[in-house]
Each structure stands twice: as C-alpha cells, then as structure tokens.
Amino acid sequence: MNAAKVLDDLKRRFPNEPEYHQAVEEVLSTIEEEYNKHPEFDKVNLIERLCIPDRVYQFRVTWMDDKGNIQTNMGYRVQHNNAIGPYKGGIRFHASVNLSILKFLAFEQTFKNSLTTLPMGGGKGGSDFSPRGKSNAEVMRFVQAFMLELWRHIGPETDVPAGDIGVGGREVGFMFGMYKKLTHEFTGTFTGKGREFGGSLIRPEATGYGNIYFLMEMLKTKGTDLKGKTCLISGSGNVAQYTAEKVLELGGKVLTMSDSDGYIYDPDGIDREKLDYIMELKNLYRGRIREYAEKYGCKYVEGARPWGEKADIALPSATQNELNGDDAKTLVANGVIAVSEGANMPSTPEAIKVFQDAKILYAPGKAANAGGVSVSGLEMTQNSIKLSWSAEEVDEKLKSIMKNIHEACVQYGT
C-alpha cells in the first residue's frame, strides 16, 4: 500500500471533502509500514474497503418554523463499517455540517469504537440545521421531520445513533419518541436517552470523564497526576463541562472555557460553583460564555481560542481543527506537559507533529474521547438485557475501558 497513492485516488473519487481526506491521511500515514508487512491485505483491497463508507444516506428535511414559514435543511447518515457490530455514532445538528465532516467523523468513529472492544461498528449522521435560537417547538418539529426519513435506516441490530454537537438529551428524546411512534417498538435504537426511558447513568458525563481517566493513565507513566495542575479547556458544551467537573474532582484547576464567540480566562480557577453557573447558562438558558466574564469579572477574549494562555495541560473539547500548528508551538513554549483530545480531530496534522517532536504526552481523540461511545455501548447492553446498572457500576466499567485503551495505545502505538 502506498499511502499517498491511495489518498490521491480518494481525493479524485471524492473531491471537495477536506475533513474526510485529512482523517484518512492521518490514519494511512501511521499504519503504512505495518500494513505493508501483510501482503494478504492488498489481495482483498482491505484499505479501500476500510476507508470508503458502506453507504451514505442524504435527504431533504422540510419543516415549519414558528411563523408558519416552510424551511428546508439537509439530513445525512453515514454508515461507515459494521464489521464488528451495528453502526454506532452520534447525530450532529450544526450549520457547518456537510458530507465531508460526517464522513470524517464516521471514519474516526469506526476506530474509536473498536478500541473499546465492545461490539460496535462506526457511523455518523446529522443535519445543517442549528438548534441555536430556535424554540423548543421548532426543534421538535424539525426533529420529527428528520426522523420521518431516518427511522427506516436504523435499529438496535442495524444502526444505533446518539447525540453530538447540537444534539443533547432534549433532541435525543424527541428523536426516540418519534421513532417509537413510527415503529411501535421500544428498543435500544438510541443511546443518550433520558434516564426515565432507558438511558444509562453516567452517559452525559462519559466523554469528559473518560478523557480525564485516559489523561490520568498517561500522567501515571510520568509519575504524576492532576493535583495542582492548571488546565486549558476549550468549549463549554457537554464534553467540556464534564471534563472540567472531573478535573476539579481530581484536584486540578480549570483556567479557561470557550464557545464559538470567544473564551474566558479565570486566573482564580473555575470552581464548582462557577462551573454550575456555566452548566445552567449553557444547558438551560443557551447563553454565551461572555456572560460568565460579566458575572465574575474575569478576562474575556472575543473571536479567539484559549491556547495562548499558560497552563500545564491542554484539553481541546470543542470541534475539529481548533488547534493549529502555531497554537501547538505556543503551548509547548508555555510548558504544557500533556494534550488530551476531548473533541474529534481538534488538532491539525501540523499541531500533532509539534507535540510529537516536543515529546510531550499527546492523546488523540480516537482514544481519549472514547468514553462517550463506551457508555453508549453499556447503555445498549442494559437495554438488551432489560436491566439498569448503578452509577458506580457504570463508572467502574468506564474506568476499566479507558485504562485498557491506554494500555493498547502504549503496546501498539508509536
């Protein structure tokens, strides 16, 4: 296998999909040497079968806003690979969503899910609809229209969606409710459901908690932990919130959080009370992070990301390609000892090279943020056996999975 040749061929066949090309390039460049030790792989064209999705669904979503106007959006579901289990991956509602982004996410999801050792394939879906600024009624009408097409392509043994950016408990609840209405079935077809109707304890916290459990395993290899360490966190959604919560629980200090408008820097640290305010601001009122700065009198930088601030650990938890090569150089120069990715592909290839050259601890999102899908897999298990585990049971299983993923990375990684 010649990685450059395979990538060029994919670019020719699937042009104008930069995020997908980037994700494939990152994987091919790291496995090329090992792959070529196995000529039997090429005989069955394994690499193309791994890179190209099994199927892609695209559809128009037509819905009515509160003013009675008809709106249209695009809906997608990428079913990438089901070699080891049903397709599994979130649904994203954001104006930036396109086929390239969803193909990259589904590709990454396939590897992430396999690392958990749970029987889950990889998939991803979503729409260019943004819940921001929409009423509950508008979100519900859109979701119901979205599900009128999606429901026929999913199922507990076929494809099990979950939440992602723009899709939280409210949206998953609307989707699951519409799915039940259309199918007349109560099955584990969605994860991230409300606790009252088949959801799992620890699922909302799982991606953030899992990232910190993975980080702790990395820090152990250097004989240290989170106590007294300062942390830069990007984002202020689900992943960032529970990343911050676990950092505080383990004795670390959170200095920053952000949203698409800018970031806050609180030198006194975002403590439990302040984090509760952010959770209420974001989850209940759908507010902006600058309101935190107005309330607590700390620094707010508009239109920027927090990577120029000085800290011990960086935890990118917002979105893809949010941390570039220059940001990485600044972090290294400021003495960062570890970077652990809570988001999917938040670091550009240039940034990753900077971290690797500097020999700091670096955890790629495929491994570090696998906690969310791990607990989704545990939710699927609980649904299938009609049992519900305690928070302590689920958390212990999550810790064990993240520890095993770290051990696999140490054993087989480069």
What role is predicted for each listed range?
Residues N2-A23, M218, S317, V332-T414:
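Adenosine-phosphate binding glycine-rich loop
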Residues E40-Q71:
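Structured beta-strand/loop patches that form or line metal/cofactor-binding pockets in enzymes
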Residues F59-K124, D128:
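Phosphate-interaction motifs
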Residues H94, N113-K227:
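Glycine/serine-rich phosphate-binding loop and adjoining beta1-alpha1 elements at the start
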Residues F104, T158-A162, F186-F190, I233, ...:
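General beta-strand structural signal in soluble alpha/beta enzymes
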Residues T191-G194, G199-K310:
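Glycine-rich phosphate/diphosphate-binding loop of Rossmann-like nucleotide-binding domains
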Residues V301-A311, N321-A338:
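Rossmann-fold NAD(P) dinucleotide-binding segment
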